[in-house]
Regions:
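Short, structured motif recognition centered on aromatic/hydrophobic residues
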Residues: 43, 56-57, 114-125, 133, ...
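Extended amphipathic alpha-helical interaction segments
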Residues: 118-238
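Start-of-domain marker
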Residues: 31-68
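Bacterial signal peptide processing site
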Residues: 26-29
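A cross-kingdom marker for long, charged
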Residues: 40, 205-296
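Signal peptide-directed extracytoplasmic domains
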Residues: 74-106, 116, 134
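Bacterial N-terminal signal peptides that target proteins for export
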Residues: 2-14
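C-terminal motif of bacterial Sec signal peptides marking the signal peptidase cleavage site
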Residues: 21-24
C-alpha cells in the first residue's frame, strides 16, 4: 500500500481519481464524470492559474480519465466479480491478498500517470507559480504536524477504530458487537505511523523546494527522481511499521467479512453489483483516449 503516500499533492488527486468513485455515494457515474471539475478545484487551492492554464490542465485530466475509463475500469469489473464469487465459501487470506494486490497494482499505474501529469503540467508554469505551489505544500506540512504530532495514543487508536468501522459498515451496514471487537482488538496492535509519515513527507517537500528554488532547467527530472527514490530514503522503522500495519489491516478486513450476517452478505453483494453496473456504464460512455495529451 505504498501508493497511499504520494508526492506533490498526487495522493489527494489519486484519491479523487480512484477512491472518490468508490466512495459509496448514490451515483458513481455522476462523480466520475465530474472528476475533472473536482480536481480542478483542488489544484486551484495550491497554485493560481490563468484561464488558459486551467483549460490546459482540464484537457490533461480529461485525457487521464479517458485512459482510466478505457484501460483500467474493465479490470475493476472482473476483480469485483471474482471477489463476490470468493465470498460463497468464506473469504480466504489468499483471496483477499489477491484482490488487495490487484488494487495496489492498479493504483501504482494510476499513480505513475498522475505523476506524469503533474510534472508535465508543472513544466508549463512560471517559476513564481512553482514556488507558490511548494509554499502551499509547506503550509500543509505545518498543519499536518500540528494535527498529528499532538495526537495522543488513545486518540490515535480511536481514530483507527472509527475509520475501520466507518469504511466496513458502508458495505455491510451496522456491524455486530463481535465485528467491532475484532476491529478493536487488532487495531490495538497497530504501530503508530503518523509521526514517521509526517517526517517522511516533510523530507521530500524540503527536497522539492530546493530543486524548484534553484530553477534548473532539469528540475522535472530532479523532481521525478525525488519521488522515485523516496522509498530508498525512508527510515527502516517506517518500512517496518508500514508492513506490520498492512498485515493487521488485512486481518481486520478478513475477520469482519467472514463474520458477516446473512443481511450483511446481501448488502455487500448488492454494493458490489452497483459498482459493477456503474463501472460498465462508464466504460460504455467513455471517449477515445487522447494519447497526445497523455504523452503517449
Amino acid at each position: 500500500m505504498s501508493w497511499l503516500i504520494l508526492p506533490f499533492g498526487a495522493r489527494r488527486l489519486l484519491i479523487l481519481g480512484v477512491l472518490l468513485c468508490l466512495s459509496g455515494c448514490s451515483s458513481t457515474t455522476f462523480l466520475y464524470n465530474r472528476l475533472d471539475t473536482l480536481i480542478g478545484w483542488y489544484v486551484l487551492d495550491y497554485v493560481s492559474l490563468s484561464r488558459d492554464q486551467r483549460n490546459d490542465f482540464n484537457r490533461r485530466v480529461d485525457a487521464l480519465l479517458d485512459w482510466h475509463r478505457a484501460e483500467e475500469l474493465p479490470a475493476y469489473v472482473v476483480w469485483l466479480h471474482e471477489f463476490e464469487e470468493s465470498l460463497d465459501e468464506g473469504l480466504t487470506e489468499v483471496e483477499l491478498d489477491k484482490l488487495v494486490d490487484q488494487l495496489e497494482e492498479a493504483a501504482s499505474r494510476l499513480q505513475a500517470k498522475v505523476l506524469d501529469l503533474l510534472i508535465n503540467f508543472g513544466a508549463t508554469l512560471s517559476h513564481e507559480q512553482r514556488i507558490e505551489f511548494v509554499l502551499t505544500l509547506q503550509k500543509d506540512q505545518a498543519e499536518l504536524e500540528k494535527k498529528y504530532l499532538a495526537r495522543t495514543d488513545d486518540a490515535y487508536y480511536q481514530d483507527i477504530q472509527q475509520q475501520f468501522q466507518k469504511n466496513l459498515s458502508r458495505f455491510l451496514g451496522t456491524l455486530t458487537d463481535s465485528q467491532k471487537n475484532a476491529i478493536e482488538e487488532r487495531s490495538a496492535k497497530y504501530q503508530r505511523l503518523d509521526f514517521l509519515w509526517v517526517e517522511d513527507r516533510g523530507r521530500w517537500v524540503s527536497q522539492l523546494e530546493r530543486v524548484l528554488r534553484v530553477n534548473d532547467p532539469d528540475w522535472p527530472d530532479q523532481a521525478r527522481e525525488i519521488y522515485l527514490k523516496r522509498r530508498d530514503n525512508r527510515d527502516s522503522a517506517y518500512e517496518q511499521a508500514f508492513a506490520r500495519n498492512t498485515i493487521i489491516s488485512r486481518e481486520i478486513i478478513l475477520s469482519v467479512l467472514n463474520q458477516r450476517t446473512s443481511k450483511q452478505d446481501l448488502r455487500l453483494r448488492r454494493e458490489i453489483g452497483k459498482y459493477c453496473t456503474d463501472f460498465e456504464a462508464l466504460i460504455e460512455s467513455g471517449q477515445p483516449i487522447n494519447r497526445e495529451a497523455l504523452g503517449l
